[in-house]
Amino acid sequence: TMCYSHTTTSRAILTNCGENSCYRKSRRHPPKMVLGRGCGCPPGDDYLEVKCCTSPDKCNY
């Protein structure tokens, strides 16, 4: 699966992931900034909302 991968300070690049899922991590509270994207599906918490997706490629835009 092709996923976008970056942190808050890096430019987004496309990564070919071994996992079948991508994630997009963002703040739950305003300002709702996107804090990173990448491979897999890490858990969220009270501050971070993690949206995971499995298809199509680049689904974590």
Curated annotation (Swiss-Prot):
Expressed by the venom gland. InterPro entries: Snake_3FTx, Snake_toxin-like_sf, Snake_toxin_con_site, Toxin_cobra-type. Keywords: Disulfide bond, Secreted, Toxin. GO terms for molecular function: toxin activity. Disulfide bonds join C3-C22, C17-C39, C41-C52, C53-C59. Its main location: secreted. GO terms for cellular component: extracellular region. Pfam families: Toxin_cobra-type. PROSITE patterns: SNAKE_TOXIN (PS00272). SUPFAM superfamilies: Snake toxin-like (SSF57302). It is found in: Secreted. Interferes with neuromuscular transmission by inhibiting the enzyme acetylcholinesterase (AChE) present at the neuromuscular junction. It selectively binds and inhibits with a 1:1 stoichiometry the mammalian and electric fish AChE at picomolar concentrations. It is highly specific for the peripheral site of AChE and blocks the entry of acetylcholine into the active site of the enzyme, thereby preventing its breakdown. It has been called fasciculin since after injection into mice it causes severe, generalized and long-lasting (5-7 hours) fasciculations. Belongs to the three-finger toxin family. Short-chain subfamily. Acn-esterase inhibitor sub-subfamily. This is Fasciculin-1. It comes from Dendroaspis angusticeps (Eastern green mamba).
